């Protein structure tokens, strides 16, 4: 069943899994932002945020059953504002250029919700995180995805939004996490100067200092990740960048493991999994995305991929 995409409602196709994935990394449809088609079976078009959260909890309960005992869930989710729309228009996202972003009328979005005021930030990410924790997941960390190139907003009474969340959740108290695989370069590490018993920081601009016992060229990865959004020309909908989930896959799995994505979309998870010598299993509501996903897997080349050209020793030329 490895390297397979099951088309249909993930609330049904997840029940067909006959193998255990080491981890799940996914970005589900956000609440009330876009209509991807699929009518009643699509997630994100629920009448209330609470109904959306309930459906997401059901999905990730099935995901948990598909994971190994030491498995993890890496969940990218954005927030939404409550804006009452009398005509109930939302953008339509499809593969067809002729239908891209055309508004459609949906009475679901024109309902006034009790407890929400116009312009309220709903708080979807933390509503979902707490609901998953209550359902049995271990909520281990919130990671901030900082976007250096956010979508422009014509707002004058708040800041332009330039971040989303990635939540790290685990199936059990003890879980697989490869800290070494995602360590970052340390920009101000020192070396021991035994002549005067102090440390020097050559090239860092810092003054020599004492009191350190050890120093390292790397450090633990921080919880704010700056990753630029990169549109994929083959799709007319949002895709999360491969560079965003590469650290998730590296930390949460080993080569040969299965990576699960119940909302495969354009196939970012599958492309990253294969580039890192992992396998994937995914679910996708729209069968027409299959060709796009396979093309992305074939065409994707990681930014850090080392050239395969043979090196030349200068001594061989002389």
PLM features: residue spans?
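Flexible, disordered linker segments and immediate boundary regions flanking tandem C2H2 zinc-finger modules
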Residues: 304-309
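Core catalytic lobe of class I
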Residues: 1-303, 314-317
